[in-house]
Amino acid sequence: MEKEFVFGHQNPDTDAIGTAIAFSYLQNKLGYNTEAVALGEPNDETAYALKKFGFEAPRVIKEAAPEVDSVMLVDHNEPQQSVSDIDKVKVTHVVDHHRIMNFNTADPLYYRAEPVGCTSTIVWKMFNENDIEIPEKIAGIMLSAIISDTLLLKSPTTTDDDKEAVEALAKIAGVDYKDYGLAMLKAGTNINDKSEEELIDLDAKSFELNGHNVRVAQINVVDLPEALERKDAFLKAMEKASNDNDYDMFMLLITNILDSDSEALVVGSDETKSFFEKAFDKKLDDSEVKLPGVVSRKKQVVPPLTDAFNA
């Protein structure tokens, strides 16, 4: 059987990398020939999780077609978030927990999407449905993915399925998920050794909203005031990225993982900024606004932005 790649989105987070590893393992057990790869280097949080459970980081690819004819996608479906030559390969499987947008295929495929907090929660279900034992390492990296995406089960995206998966996977992995989870999340909050250009690209996704190219980036911190001391430099980096990549609006969500509050920085035209203000019913003050309780790009940012841009 010809090999297929399994990968998550660009600027991969712990879900994108961890779930690719787990889903590749599952598919190989089901008779496929797959390799988990990544569309970027792991961030500090993901690197912490990989090291904890004894994984090497998946190799990074820029294109898929030179090596494979078919691919499996996890944690994304929108082509602008995928590998650069996604139009040159056949997508045979998708497992995701996001909206479906701009996605179509020439052939039938396996597509599974559920409104849960993390893609690994769906893959955990698939292991159980197929009666395939989850190894300790795989359980650990899936647990890490769910903790990451749900902010230790505190995000509004968290479902009972996520909670059940965390309990089960922590038992297999042999860790206290609360202690491990907090340590892992904190490992991803050190922003002092990174430039503003790096930080706004670490966890960023592009969305097509009614003809507008909107970029939404997020960084997690434990000291929000300290992060905001770099506000001017962040805005400058966001302006440059917008000019270089034709973004109509760039939003940076800076989230305090300890109290689940965020501050947003926004650059764009007067029109796109007005859409932002309409989405959150708040006025920007010098390109900045407080967003109490907002921690999820998927559930609390993209839906209101979509509504505002489409109004």
Curated annotation (Swiss-Prot):
Organism, as annotated: Lactobacillus acidophilus (strain ATCC 700396 / NCK56 / N2 / NCFM)
UniProt cross-references to HAMAP family, sorted A to Z: PPase_C
Binding site for Mn(2+) 1: H9, D13, D75
Cofactor note: Binds 2 manganese ions per subunit.
Short name of one Pfam family: DHHA2
Gene3D superfamilies in UniProt: DHHA2 domain, inorganic pyrophosphatase (n-terminal core)
E.C. numbers: 3.6.1.1
Protein name: Probable manganese-dependent inorganic pyrophosphatase
Claim: NADP is one of the keywords in the record: no
Matches recorded under InterPro entries: DDH_dom, DHH_sf, DHHA2, DHHA2_dom_sf, Mn-dep_inorganic_PyrPase, Oligoribo/pAp-PDE_c-di-AMP_PDE
GO CC entries: cytoplasm
Obligatory cofactor(s): Mn(2+)
Protein family membership: Belongs to the PPase class C family.
Binding site for Mn(2+) 2: D15, D75, H97, D149
GO molecular function, one term: inorganic diphosphate phosphatase activity
Cellular localization per UniProt: Cytoplasm
This protein's UniProt keywords: Cytoplasm, Hydrolase, Manganese, Metal-binding
Catalytic activity: diphosphate + H2O = 2 phosphate + H(+)
Domain of life: Bacteria
UniProt entry tagged with the keyword Lipid metabolism: no
EC class of the enzyme, as a word: hydrolase
